[in-house]
Regions:
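Acidic, low-complexity intrinsically disordered regions
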Residues: 1-217
């Protein structure tokens, strides 16, 4: 294993329901990226944007060479093929690690998955297949964080093989998205140093979600 090397993978929803939140998503992602560029240690960044199709805009790029996300990259529209996006990306990274020299395999691997709606367009992967893939990689020490809006994220995460302790419901608006990326940055910083995520790593998101949900009631 290569010490101080982190495999950091983002799978980000850009379906039609994200319309109006492009600027916040781009800004939140770029702000998080800039913070991580200043931290010690090597990081390989993969970024997959998905609707009914997936597009990989960064494929294991060294973090200091990753360009900022732009409006040309993050164009919303279409449906939500979450299972295909996750399945394809996990398979891709899995195969790279499988055939790499042992000394080149990253010490840490973290997937950050964000969606704002229910799966409704996948044709290549089933939920059972994705769950099996994720559970296999968790046994190898991979971490998966799942952020969901307008769904029961805990239930969806469970169906994907992601424990509720690694799942957060969030408010899909400017404040919620920016809070997501701020918390993700803290989590990435923690894992990059080899520390375990604290039990309350998502406390800020949970509090924002519950407080504003209660106000609506």
């Amino acid at each position: 294993m290569k010490q101080n090397l982190t495999e950091l993978v983002f799978i980000i929803d850009r379906s039609g329901s994200m319309a109006g939140l492009e600027v916040d998503t781009i800004g939140g992602f770029n702000g998080m990226l800039q913070k991580q560029k200043k931290a010690e240690g090597e990081v390989l960044v993969t970024t997959v944007l998905f609707n009914h199709e997936s597009q990989t805009i960064h494929d294991r790029v060294e973090i200091d060479k990753v360009p900022l996300l732009t409006e040309n990259d993050y164009c919303v529209g279409g449906c939500t093929a979450l299972l295909d996006a996750v399945g394809e990306t996990v398979e891709h990274i899995k195969n790279i690690h499988k055939y790499a020299r042992a000394e080149d395999v990253p010490q840490h691997t973290l997937f950050v998955i964000t969606t704002d709606g229910m799966e409704n367009a996948s044709t290549k992967y089933s939920c059972v297949q994705v769950k099996r893939l994720i559970e296999e990689q968790k046994e190898r020490g991979w971490e998966f964080l799942f952020f969901g809006a307008n769904i029961d994220a805990v239930d969806v995460g469970h169906d994907l093989g992601i424990a509720k302790e690694r799942v957060a419901n969030f408010n899909n608006d400017a404040k919620g998205i920016n809070l997501n990326f701020a918390v993700v940055s803290e989590a990435v910083s923690c894992l990059r140093t080899g520390k375990q995520l604290k039990a309350d790593w998502k406390k800020k998101i949970d509090e924002d979600y519950k407080n504003r949900k209660n106000k609506i009631k």
